[in-house]
């Protein structure tokens, strides 16, 4: 079994996964509704924090190190979230949803250590097998927020999509629809029972480049595969 599958929260701790699924569903019902999140995740985070009467600064700028995806910290009562915009947009979106979990824990569970000490998301925390329990939960929460099972099943019913380890276009369609990274979408469809363990294992052994090339060929989802290089650091001037 691929280590990414073996170590995902869905298999590693189903009780904890089910608790997170309920929390994510409640969060969506209160702060998102039926909307497909995609790049509105940045507004979702800010609106959520402000609704809880906390202050937040969401900073976006390109960092010349694509191993670094995002980080969050607390300074003088202000929550600072930084997103690396040199990453493909779908990675930025997932990184933001991951950081949302740390913020959620801080606000809802009074777990100040989650961001007072700083939360840093790197590529290995998403892309590799061995991650901390905290980041494993944050990855699961992010996927539950961005692509809940109910919306996946609804989209499958509408489109009649099928999923095999050899036909990648249906997978790419869902990556596009939910603005999810490749491996995250494979794991999500496995979690929803749309891929068997064997199929997911084959797909996770494939080079991501193969998927990206096919996406370009079909002109599907290319928007999410490009960096934005957005820079809003000027918004910090008021704090200096």
Where are the language model's segments positioned?
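Active-site hotspot residues in diverse enzymes, especially metal/ion-binding acidic/histidine motifs
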Residues: 1-240
């Amino acid at each position: 079994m691929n280590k990414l599958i073996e170590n995902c929260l869905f298999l590693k701790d189903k009780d904890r996964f089910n608790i997170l699924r309920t929390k994510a569903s409640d969060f969506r019902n209160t702060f998102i509704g039926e909307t497909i999140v995609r790049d509105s995740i940045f507004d979702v985070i800010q609106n959520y924090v402000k609704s809880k009467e906390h202050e937040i600064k969401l900073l976006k700028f390109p960092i010349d190190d694509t191993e670094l995806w995002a980080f969050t910290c607390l300074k003088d009562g202000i929550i600072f979230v930084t997103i690396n915009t040199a990453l493909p947009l779908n990675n930025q979106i997932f990184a933001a949803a991951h950081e949302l979990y740390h913020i959620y824990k801080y606000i809802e569970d009074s777990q100040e250590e989650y961001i007072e000490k700083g939360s840093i998301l790197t590529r290995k925390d998403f892309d590799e097998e061995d991650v901390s329990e905290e980041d494993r939960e944050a990855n699961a929460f992010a996927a539950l927020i961005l692509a809940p099972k109910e919306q996946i099943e609804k989209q499958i019913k509408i489109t009649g999509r099928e999923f095999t380890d050899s036909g990648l276009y249906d997978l790419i369609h869902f990556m596009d629809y939910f603005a999810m990274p490749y491996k995250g979408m494979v794991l999500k469809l496995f979690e929803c029972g749309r891929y068997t363990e064997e199929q997911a294992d084959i797909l996770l052994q494939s080079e991501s480049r193969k998927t990206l090339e096919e996406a370009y060929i079909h002109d599907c989802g290319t928007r999410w595969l490009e960096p934005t290089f957005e820079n809003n650091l000027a918004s910090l001037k008021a704090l200096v």
